[in-house]
Swiss-Prot record:
Localisation: Plastid
Similarity field: Belongs to the bacterial ribosomal protein bS18 family.
Gene Ontology biological process terms in this record: translation
An annotated Gene Ontology molecular function: small ribosomal subunit rRNA binding
Taxonomic path: Eukaryota, Viridiplantae, Streptophyta, Embryophyta, Tracheophyta
Name of the protein in its database record: Small ribosomal subunit protein bS18c
Main location: plastid
Keyword Plastid: yes
Gene that this polypeptide is encoded by: rps18
Alphabetical list of Pfam families matching this protein: Ribosomal_S18
Organism: Cuscuta gronovii
Length: 142
């Protein structure tokens, strides 16, 4: 008895079947660009039946209509607008990464220079002048 009411019991919730992507009034035609654009990916590829939830007959008609629209220049073969946007985003990201890399490099050099300046010590050169036989000293910094 416990197994029936356990966690593996199927729920009896009702669910609503989603509306079909193509209504009965929509006509699949190469001139209906608004309809065709809904079934093309951002890259310009034709979406599969599994994604679009179309029937086999609708998908065949849609493929033919999209191909005709491409040949007649109603639709682009590749969606260049989204490609250009994507390329621009990539370019901006690369520039930003390069700027960050250069800033980090400058910061490392600055830090190293400060460390070198702190490590500088003074030393004395001791030498004997043969003419004076006096002990001369000079202080230098490295």
């Amino acid at each position: 008895m416990d197994r029936i009411t356990g966690p593996f019991r199927k729920s009896k919730k009702s669910f609503r079947k989603p509306l079909p992507p193509i209504q009965s009034g929509d006509r699949i035609d190469y001139q209906n660009i608004d309809l065709l654009r809904r079934f093309i990916s951002q890259q310009g590829k034709i979406l599969s039946r599994r994604v679009t939830r179309l029937t086999l007959k609708q998908q065949r008609l849609l493929n033919l209509a999209i191909k005709q629209a491409r040949i007649l220049s109603f639709l682009p073969f590749t969606n260049t607008e989204s490609l250009e946007k994507m390329k621009a985003r990539i370019r901006e990201a690369r520039l930003k990464a390069e700027e960050v890399r250069l800033k980090n490099k400058e910061a490392r050099f600055k830090k190293a220079k400060e460390a070198r300046n702190q490590k500088k010590t003074t030393f004395r050169k001791i030498f004997i002048n043969p003419k004076n036989s006096k002990l001369n000293t000079e202080t230098n910094q490295i």
